[in-house]
């Protein structure tokens, strides 16, 4: 099992007031699954994704990632796992404007200490996979929103992560480009990628094999795509 959550909770405390962002989350995700976590703004989706991505820690319950008890890891151990095993796709793309598309995708590999030849091979491979090889020498401002999100997906893939976490990946896109990004994620899933996506849009949640509803910090329902039955 790749992801195991047991009675997971997250609370924030301010001036002796407790705000429970997540409560009683129990969930298992196997390697190779495509899961959408769907719910309205403020329901805890981004908090859950931050915990899954080791950017935040729960205040209750247990989280095991690839068999490791996350709550027992040090900050440096979490950072190492995050950098090597988790790919992030953000709503705002988070591309660096002064770097070319090639350089944006290459940057995480530089920090890993890969050789120039290794980096070139990997960058070319992932740009081809997201159909953006022809844009390698361009800069983010020269691309449409849909194209920038494709580059963001390529960057997330570059390190060959165990899991892709997508935070509202269609949030800044029109319907046509949003559907194109959803088609790309479905294609990556067919290649074997494990994908967990949070979205407020039921139309896009339907693209996942499993759609899990989140409301007021709690899991409320789960649906399996008809194609998976």
Where does each model-flagged region fall?
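ABC ATPase nucleotide-binding domains
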Residues: 227-229
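ABC family nucleotide-binding domain
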Residues: 2-214
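H-loop (His-switch) and adjacent beta-strand-loop-beta switch element
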Residues: 211-224
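Short amphipathic beta-strand/extended segments with alternating polar/hydrophobic composition
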Residues: 72, 224-225
């Amino acid at each position: 099992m790749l992801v195991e959550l047991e009675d997971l909770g997250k609370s924030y405390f301010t001036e002796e007031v407790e705000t429970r962002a997540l409560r009683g989350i129990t969930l298992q995700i196997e390697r190779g699954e495509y899961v959408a976590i769907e719910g309205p703004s403020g329901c805890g989706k981004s908090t859950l994704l931050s915990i899954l991505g080791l950017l935040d820690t729960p205040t209750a319950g247990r989280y095991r990632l690839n068999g490791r008890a996350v709550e027992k890891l040090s900050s440096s151990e979490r950072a190492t796992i995050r950098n090597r095993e988790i790919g992030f796709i953000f709503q705002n793309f988070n591309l660096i404007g002064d770097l070319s598309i090639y350089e944006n995708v290459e940057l995480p590999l530089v920090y890993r200490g890969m050789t120039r030849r290794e980096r070139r091979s990997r960058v070319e491979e992932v740009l081809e996979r997201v159909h953006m090889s022809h844009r390698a020498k361009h800069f983010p401002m020269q691309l449409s929103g849909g194209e920038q999100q494709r580059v963001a997906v390529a960057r997330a893939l570059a390190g060959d992560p165990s899991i892709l976490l997508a935070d509202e990946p269609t949030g800044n896109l029109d319907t046509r480009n949003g559907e194109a990004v959803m088609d790309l994620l479905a294609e990556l899933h067919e290649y074997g990628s494990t994908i967990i996506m949070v979205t407020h849009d039921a139309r896009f949640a339907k693209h996942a094999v499993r759609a899990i509803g989140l409301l007021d910090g709690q899991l409320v329902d789960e649906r399996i795509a008809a194609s998976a039955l």
